[in-house]
Amino acid sequence: GLWSKIKEAAKTAGKAAMGFVDEMV
């Protein structure tokens, strides 16, 4: 459903954000 899609997108965005932070440090 829509909610699982939102959760998947949030998970992916979270991983991308963590990777971005790792690049910055």
Curated annotation (Swiss-Prot):
Entry keyword annotation includes Acetylation: no
Pfam families noted in UniProt: DD_K
Keyword Disulfide bond on entry: no
Keyword annotations: Amidation, Amphibian defense peptide, Antimicrobial, Secreted
Subcellular location: Secreted
Annotated GO biological process: defense response
GO CC annotation terms, alphabetical: extracellular region
Valine amide: modified positions: V25
Organs and tissues of expression: Expressed by the skin glands.
UniProt function note: Has antimicrobial activity.
Family: Belongs to the frog skin active peptide (FSAP) family. Dermaseptin subfamily.
Annotated protein name in UniProt: Dermaseptin-5.2TR
Species classification: Eukaryota, Metazoa, Chordata, Craniata, Vertebrata
